[in-house]
């Protein structure tokens, strides 16, 4: 017997509360899939359960093959805000909205950026080692330093960049913002200094924190040429997306002493290969792309994802969360 229920694929990382928002409706059936499922297995699973009407994605790629396999896709939504793994033009051609979790993980990513700045400034790893290894007497040879009074350059002034600025202003830092899509008035109203020339601003910064999306415009933005513009005492923080920073160029700058250090939550290849050159540098701290995946953020993102799906199925998608509003 054919079911009239809408079939929704959800990744294993979706929270119980979010699942309940979907399953409490008698017109919805959910099918769970692994967060790190391979492309062939995902496509086969979609075909097996077709028609599939909605999908809540984690790290899984989604494009034309998956749309074809689904049969009757109505909405694709991410448990997150990045969508570089989704073929947006393919969705738009089929009039399928792509939705994201709005500001759900923005506080978490902003905290991670600040955490990385503080970890590097306060030399947390080195201080811990001195106590643990009994080299207390050498503590004055590697003094930590303050964020107070330092200059931060934020790249991208969206949901996360604005929150990072707010936190760093509270640390009494001077905050520069480069975002060609935001007005100087908006940036200044937030207590920051707007800069229109990235290359001219880089030599001024003690820290550079990247918060822009990964697009053709931003891929390779921090290459060897741009890294050379930074002060040798400066630090680079990337909690945005891998590929915005050219890792080979970053490694060369760090080894040559042209850059003081870096904090990386994202990488060109994820996971990065074991033994990757950056792994061996003492002035680099890393995290496995978890800046936006705190306990609280997962709950917020999951619930927003469920609401996105319901809004689309009910014919009124939450417009501010739609990446391709031209399909509406």
What are these regions (language model features)?
Residues 157-158:
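Glycine-rich Rossmann-fold phosphate-binding loop(s) that bind the pyrophosphate
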Residues 33-34, 79-80, 96-107, 179, ...:
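Short beta->alpha connector loops at strand-helix junctions that form conserved
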Residues 47, 63-64, 180-277:
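Rossmann-like adenosine-cofactor binding region
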Residues 28, 192-193, 283-284:
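Short, conserved active-site loop motifs that form the nucleotide-linked donor/cofactor pocket
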Residues 52-54, 75, 207, 235, ...:
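Short, Asp-centered acidic motifs that coordinate Mg2+ and/or phosphate
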Residues 94-96, 102-151, 163-166, 170, ...:
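Phosphate-binding beta-alpha-beta segment of Rossmann-like dinucleotide-binding domains, i.e.
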Residues 94, 233-328:
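Rossmann-like dinucleotide-binding domain for NAD(H)/NADP(H)
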């Amino acid at each position: 017997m054919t079911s009239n229920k809408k079939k929704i694929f959800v990744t294993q990382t979706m929270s119980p509360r979010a699942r309940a928002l979907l399953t409490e409706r008698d017109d919805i059936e959910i099918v769970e899939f692994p967060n790190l499922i391979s492309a062939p297995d995902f496509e086969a699973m979609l075909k097996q359960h077709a028609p599939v009407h909605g999908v809540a994605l984690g790290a899984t790629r989604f494009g034309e093959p998956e749309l074809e396999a689904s049969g009757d896709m109505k909405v694709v939504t991410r448990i997150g805000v990045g969508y570089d793994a989704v073929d947006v033009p393919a969705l738009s051609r089929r009039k399928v909205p792509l939705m994201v979790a709005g500001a759900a993980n923005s506080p978490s990513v902003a905290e991670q950026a600040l955490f990385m700045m503080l970890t590097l400034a306060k030399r947390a790893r080195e201080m811990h080692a001195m106590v643990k290894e009994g080299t207390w007497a050498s503590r004055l040879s590697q003094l930590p330093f303050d964020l107070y009074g330092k200059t931060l350059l934020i790249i991208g002034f969206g949901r996360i960049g604005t929150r990072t600025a707010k936190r760093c202003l509270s640390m009494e830092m001077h905050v520069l913002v480069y975002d060609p899509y935001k007005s100087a008035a908006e940036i200044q109203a937030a207590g920051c200094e707007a800069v229109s020339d990235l290359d001219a601003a880089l030599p001024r910064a003690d820290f550079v924190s990247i918060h822009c999306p990964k697009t053709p415009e931003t891929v390779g933005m921090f290459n060897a040429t741009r890294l050379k513009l930074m002060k040798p005492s400066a630090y680079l923080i990337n909690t945005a997306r891998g590929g915005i920073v050219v890792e080979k160029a970053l490694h060369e700058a760090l080894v040559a002493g042209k850059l003081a250090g870096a904090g990386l939550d994202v990488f060109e290849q994820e996971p990065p290969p074991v033994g990757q050159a950056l792994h061996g540098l003492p002035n680099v701290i890393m995290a496995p792309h978890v800046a936006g995946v705190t306990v609280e953020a997962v709950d917020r993102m999951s619930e927003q994802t469920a609401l996105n799906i319901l809004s689309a199925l009910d014919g009124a998608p939450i417009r501010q969360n739609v990446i391709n509003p031209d399909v509406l």
